[in-house]
Amino acid sequence: MTKTLAGPAVAALLAAVAMPVAAQTTTLRIQNHNAPESTTGRLIAEFVENVETMSGGDIDVEMFYSASVVKSAETFDAAASGILDCDMTNGSYQTGKNPAFQFVADTMGGYDTPVQFHAWVSHGGGHEMIDDLYNAQGMTLVGNHVGGQESLNSTRPLAGAADLQDFKFRSPPGMESEIFANLGASPIVMDFTEIFTALETGIIDGADASTLANNVGLGIYDIAKHTTYPGFHSMSADHLACRTDVWEAMPEAHRAILTAAEKALALDLMTLTEVENGEALVTKLPELGVTVYDWSTEDRAAFREAAQTAWNDWATRTPETEAIVQSHRDFLQRIGLSE
């Protein structure tokens, strides 16, 4: 005898089948070290909007600017330990863990343009090398972003290498401090967010902060009336890196959205920095009374020589540093920037 489902049972079954499955949501607490009004800060705000729009609201990003939760250099560990979920600062802050972290962000005297650095990341094995380094710390690399060569800023003339003698300036931790110390300067390592106050109070004569455009946004040229341009000494790439268990728990679609939004941020930062650097050079810096110094070929060569000496030294410190330095050298040769 064939039994049929009663009307209420059929209705209940059909309702269950038709009921949409609730979308998985992702909530991320991310810290960066940029001021909201800076070039990078404004583009990070667009990154947040893009992520939330592309996910239909299923990814909720709580973004903290200007290292408002922990100090800039502590962001990576804060994400790894669960205070935050992701880090949007700079890998070179972590050179104390392994000197190889210097070369995930700023080769100093290596690449000339952001495109060349991104080419190494995307097509020279860079992403995999960085990710391996981060995985050992419980973090996963999503992507990198960099605007362009940075400018040194000073409250005193900075026309060439000779002016570096006894020049007290803010430096990030890592290889840069050693290079400039060898050139006669007195680098002082301090948090990115402390630069303005240190300049204002005279603790430092100048700073290595960021690009012309970002420096304008940070208000540095309200105090420091001397700067170098075009930049030559540093092109430091920030990153988006998330705690590995958080990253792996996300739906694949959410990981794809974050990766795509980070790539869009990287492209926008390169192009907007080009525009805003030019605007700063032509209009804003003259209005602020800033003197711009284009270092001679000889002075730039002196810096590059000091940087390459530092590369050789740092490459001996750990196997990971040796490998990543060699990777950069191989890629520089591959794209015709070195012999």
Where are these regions (language model features)?
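N-terminal secretory/targeting leader peptides
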Residues: 10, 24-117, 125-339
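N-terminal signal peptide c-region/cleavage motif recognized by signal peptidases
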Residues: 18-20
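Absolute N-terminal positional cue centered near the fourth residue
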Residues: 4-5, 22, 26
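Bacterial N-terminal signal peptides that target proteins for export
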Residues: 1-9
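Acidic/charged coordination and interface sites in well-structured regions
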Residues: 14
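Short, conserved aromatic-histidine micro-motifs
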Residues: 121
